[in-house]
Amino acid sequence: LSGLFRGYQAIADECAKDGVSYTDYLKRLLDYELECRAHNGRQTVLKMAGFPTLKTLEMFDFKESAVNKAQITELATLRFIANAENVILLGSSGTGKTHLAISLGYLATQQRYRIRFFTAADLLLQLEVASSQNRLEQYLSKIIAGSRLLIIDEFGYVKLNETQANLFFQLVNKRYETGAIIITSNLIFTKWQEVLNNDEALTAAILDRLIHHSHII
């Protein structure tokens, strides 16, 4: 009840000034405590998200972008998270993909969804470390599957070797139809095979799982 200890005196003074009943005073105290808990919860999941910087949809200039605003507005309802659907943001550098990904992630934290943000390079490094320490399944279950939304930024800038490509498949497969993914890439889908160790079958399997139940922007 930390909120009560911090705010009870100010609320008591306010209630005395307003001449409210003792019952109303208790109600204001409880409302304040609940709001403090909600705020603390939002701050906790925001910190855990790991955003490199904070971006919001209000900061995005739709007039200077080819992005469909109506489509983003629909995504901002966060129904895609509840439905374990994916969002794939494609485009060249500087088109606002990362901004939109972080903005949607920020909205999710305000609803107290557990989310994680990674660049593709950082995520693959962590997957490799976990695999080398024989704790890949634990990592996938706790960090990856344990988040309602996983954001993978900058996929396609670095080519993956065979081990990395297989680890990426395991990650995508782990979340398939169970958790939402937002992924940004500078490459159209026909170029993904070049990044995924030129493995045609693996690329097809990854794209099949990502594109199924997805919103492509």
Regions found by a protein language model. Name each.
Residues A38-A82, N86-L90:
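Extended interfacial segments that mediate partner engagement and assembly in macromolecular machines
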Residues S2-T53:
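Interdomain "pre-motor" coupling segment immediately N-terminal to P-loop NTPase/helicase cores
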Residues R6-Q9, D24-R28, E58, T73, ...:
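Solvent-exposed alpha-helical segments within well-ordered globular domains of core cellular machineries
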Residues L149:
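Walker B motif beta-strand of ABC-family P-loop ATPases
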Residues G7-E14, V87-L90, G156, K191-Q193:
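Short hinge/gating elements
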Residues V67-A145, V195:
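Conserved P-loop
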